Amino acid sequence: MKTSIVTLLITFCFYLSVYAQAPQDKATELKEQALSSLKQKDYIKARYLFKKAYEAFAVRENYPQAIECGIQANALYVRENFYKEGFELCRNMEQLIWTGEQKQNKVFYDLRFPISKERLQMYISLKNPAQAKNQLDKLEEIASLAKNDSLMEVLLYTNCFLY
């Protein structure tokens, strides 16, 4: 009787630990499936999975992974000329970053930068030089505030691409 209770208790604890890890694994699994779909050139499925992975990482407050997946989904929106959805996703990502900054009392320049860069790419694709210039100025401001050499390097390459 005692061994069956102990066995039942151990099994219960094991299932609890597996269940607790499931949401993180689900987000990672979605990201891996999205990468696989992208590799197979199934862009619609990849976009859907990247967006779901973005949402799953956002719920877990894993901001770097969420933004990475959001940027991938946005690039696939732009690839299909879904600019309205792309701009909406950028707004959602910026809102997520703002919420995270408020919770952690620090500014995530390294996460704001790729969102602004993605928005710049959309304005370039839309042939809107005024808004592209505004986004470039915003990128320069973010890079200077971040004091991060890798962001400055990306900014230089982005400037070269623009001109």
Residue ranges of model-derived segments:
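A "functional boundary" signal
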Residues: 19-163
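Bacterial Sec-dependent N-terminal signal peptides
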Residues: 1-27
